[in-house]
Structure formats: C-alpha cells, structure tokens
Amino acid sequence: MKGYLLGLVVILILLSGECFASNLTKRDSAIMRGEKNLLIAINTDNYGLKSSAAQILGDIKSKKAVIPLMKILKSSDDENLRIVAAHSLYKINSPMGMFAVRQAIRFDESVRVRKMCLNYLVDSEK
C-alpha cells in the first residue's frame, strides 16, 4: 500500500512539473511574439507607435532591437525619437549599442541629444 501511494505521489509530482514547464514555454512564446511585434512596430512611420515600441524594447532589454534602435539614433529627423532610442540602447547596455550612444555624443547635430547621450554614458559607467 505504501509503495502504491509513493508511486502515485511521484507520478503526480512529475506531471505537475510537466504542466509548469509547458506554461513557461507558452509564456516565453508569448514574449517572443510580443518582441517580434514590437520590432515590426519600430519600423513603422507612425511616430507614437515607433516611440512606444522603442521604449518597451529598451524596458525588456531586447538584444534584437539594438540594430533598429541604432538606425533610429543615427538617422531619425526627430530629436525626441533619437533620445528615446538612445535611452533604450542605454537600458539594453550592449557594447554595440553603447558605441552608438558614444558616437551620438560626438556627431549628433542636436545639443539636447548629445547632452542626454552623455548622461546615459556617464550613468552606465557607474
């Protein structure tokens, strides 16, 4: 009887672990789909959508967003959008992204963007 009960408990534990593992997979899958949608949104012409997507990608520290964010930082006409891109690159903190922030300090036409990038760089080195 004890052996039967012990076997039943072990099976229940194994099955419950499998259920939790499948939930994590579903959650990870949802995050990946969300990240994919944000990467699509960052390439649209809609300013609000692009800005929000850039901000969220920085919040989730998406390594896949580094190149699109660098593109925005380098070539966007809107200085607010460039600042959002720089802030997201700072949050992601990849070497390539931080290099782009350093370059913006030197070469961006806007004093405001250069100043914000300098703040992000100084803060990242603390």
Predicted regions mapped to residue ranges:
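Boundary at the C-terminal end of the N-terminal hydrophobic targeting segment
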Residues: C19-A21
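Bacterial N-terminal signal peptides
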Residues: G7-S16
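Short inter-helical turns and helix N-cap capping residues of alpha-solenoid HEAT/ARM repeat scaffolds
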Residues: D45-N46, D77-D78, E109-S110
